[in-house]
C-alpha cells in the first residue's frame, strides 16, 4: 500500500547528515475514490536519529517542510495543502506568500526595508521551525536582534508528528492509480534570504530528508 522511495537511514556519507533523520510513512483513509469525493492523507514523521529537535543549530535560518502532491494516471500533478490544527502561532508553520526579515535593513541602513519572502516554499506546505522575533515582533534571522521566540514546532527526539491533508479528488482527474508522494525537505538557509544576501548556492541547497509513496485508485 505504500513504500519508502528515498531512505538514507544507512547512508553515513549523506550531506549535512540530515538525510534519513526523519522517517516518513503516509496512508489514505480510503483506497478507492470517485471524482468529487474527499480523501484524507495522513503523514507520520518520526525523529528516530537525533537526540535533539530537528532542525537544530541556527534554527532561525533553517527551514524544514513537508510537501505532499498527488499525480493522476495521466500525469497531472495536484498540490495538497496541509490541514490546519488550530494551535497558537500555526500561521508561521504553514508556507505563505508573506514578507519577513525586515530588520535586515538595520545593518544596510535601510529603515524602510520591506523584507523578503518569508518561506520560499509552496504555499500550504507544513513547516517545522521555531521562529525568532525582533523587538517589533517581526520574524528575524539575526540572533543579535532577537527579542522573543514563537511556537516551537520542530520534531523532538523520538517524537512522532502526524499531519493530515484533505484532498477532494478533482472532477477532471483521470481514472486509474493516483500516486501520493510525501517529501520532507531541508534547507540551511531559506531561498529568498540566500538570494538577497547573495550567498553561495550550496548554502540554500534543498536536501530531501526522506520521501514516501502511497496511492489511491480513482474510479471512473
Please give the residue ranges for each predicted region.
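Extended, solvent-exposed segments with strong compositional bias
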Residues: 91-163
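Short amphipathic, basic-aromatic surface patches that mediate peripheral association
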Residues: 45-58
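Internal, hydrophobic beta-strand segments that form the core of beta-sheet-rich folds
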Residues: 64, 177-189
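Short beta-strand elements
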Residues: 193-220
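Short, surface-exposed loop/turn segments at beta-strand-coil junctions that are enriched for proline
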Residues: 168-174
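Short acidic/polar inter-strand loop motif in beta-rich domains
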Residues: 50, 185-195
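Solvent-exposed, conformationally flexible loop/turn segments
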Residues: 35-38, 158-160
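Single conserved hydrophobic/aromatic residue that forms the stacking wall/gate
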Residues: 1-8, 12
Amino acid at each position: 500500500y505504500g513504500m519508502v522511495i528515498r531512505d538514507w537511514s544507512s547512508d553515513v556519507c549523506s550531506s549535512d547528515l540530515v538525510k534519513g533523520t526523519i522517517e516518513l510513512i503516509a496512508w489514505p483513509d480510503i483506497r478507492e475514490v470517485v471524482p468529487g469525493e474527499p480523501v484524507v492523507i495522513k503523514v507520520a514523521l518520526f525523529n528516530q536519529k537525533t537526540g535533539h529537535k530537528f532542525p537544530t543549530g541556527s534554527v532561525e535560518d533553517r527551514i524544514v517542510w513537508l510537501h505532499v502532491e498527488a499525480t493522476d494516471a495521466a500525469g497531472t500533478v495536484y498540490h495538497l495543502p496541509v490541514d490546519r490544527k488550530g494551535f497558537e502561532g500555526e500561521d508561521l508553520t504553514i508556507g505563505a506568500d508573506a514578507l519577513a526579515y525586515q530588520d535586515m535593513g538595520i545593518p544596510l541602513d535601510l529603515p524602510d526595508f520591506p523584507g523578503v519572502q518569508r518561506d520560499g516554499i509552496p504555499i500550504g506546505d507544513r513547516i517545522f521551525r521555531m521562529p525568532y522575533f525582533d523587538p517589533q515582533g517581526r520574524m528575524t534571522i539575526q540572533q543579535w536582534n532577537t527579542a522573543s521566540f514563537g511556537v516551537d514546532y520542530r520534531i523532538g527526539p523520538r517524537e512522532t508528528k502526524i499531519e493530515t491533508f484533505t484532498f477532494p479528488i478533482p472532477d477532471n482527474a483521470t481514472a486509474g492509480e493516483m500516486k501520493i508522494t510525501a517529501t520532507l525537505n531541508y534547507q540551511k538557509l531559506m531561498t529568498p534570504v540566500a538570494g538577497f544576501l547573495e550567498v553561495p548556492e550550496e548554502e540554500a541547497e534543498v536536501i530531501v530528508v526522506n520521501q514516501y509513496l502511497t496511492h489511491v485508485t480513482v474510479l471512473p
